[in-house]
């Protein structure tokens, strides 16, 4: 048994190392490419030793963009941050209030409304996205932060998770609040919201990354280059046809795009893990 256990441990560690290398090696190649100049990156085979042009590449794309996209990449990062933060705050606000109303208020057809919200999870994005674009166009929200963020603030998943969490809270909390004369909103802010902070943190991280990584939606909504986002902007830096792509600058843009969600995860890691664990209970 001991020998079998030791062999299983060795196999597990080997598979773990292989998995880590499979994930990190492409990122390392991208980092190396970002440190090279335009001539070095096209040498075959490309070196795996970092060069000395990283800061120059970062400065160029930050101020002037790259390739066919001359919009400063710093502006694209700002647009992505505004979009991701607005989607995150809006999605959490709408979802937690919706779940609170469904669980703690008694009104006709409340369960029907919840299942109508839940059923939207079964519709593919491709089915929902073009009718949503049509609505945004008719409301004259194209090329605006409102059009970028407002349609993505509704979340059946977050509503479902908050509903399930609220249903685990003891009824005695509500009864005690009623005896003390607390209004429904005071009960929400004084009792429910503090108990939900770990769930809020977990959903904040997940939703921020979701908003930051949006690619198709900005492409459909935005035609103004000054409202372009970082993820969509990287694609526009890649030349089409016979044009030459400045891969060193594209990889530098990729590194910058990874930093904000990485910082969010690192800063909120403890709360994020606790929120996921609490949601499983």
Curated annotation (Swiss-Prot):
Its main location: membrane. InterPro entries: MetI-like (IPR000515), MetI-like_sf (IPR035906). It holds the Pfam family BPD_transp_1. It is found in: Cell inner membrane. Residues 77-268 form the ABC transmembrane type-1 domain. Keywords: Cell inner membrane, Cell membrane, Membrane, Transmembrane, Transmembrane helix, Transport. One of its GO terms (cellular component) is plasma membrane. The chain crosses the membrane at residues 14-34, 85-105, 113-133, 142-162, 188-210, 247-267. Signal peptide: none annotated. It is a multi-pass membrane protein. One of its GO terms (biological process) is transmembrane transport. Part of the ABC transporter complex UgpBAEC involved in sn-glycerol-3-phosphate (G3P) import. Probably responsible for the translocation of the substrate across the membrane. Belongs to the binding-protein-dependent transport system permease family. UgpAE subfamily. The complex is composed of two ATP-binding proteins (UgpC), two transmembrane proteins (UgpA and UgpE) and a solute-binding protein (UgpB). This is sn-glycerol-3-phosphate transport system permease protein UgpE. It comes from Pectobacterium atrosepticum (strain SCRI 1043 / ATCC BAA-672).
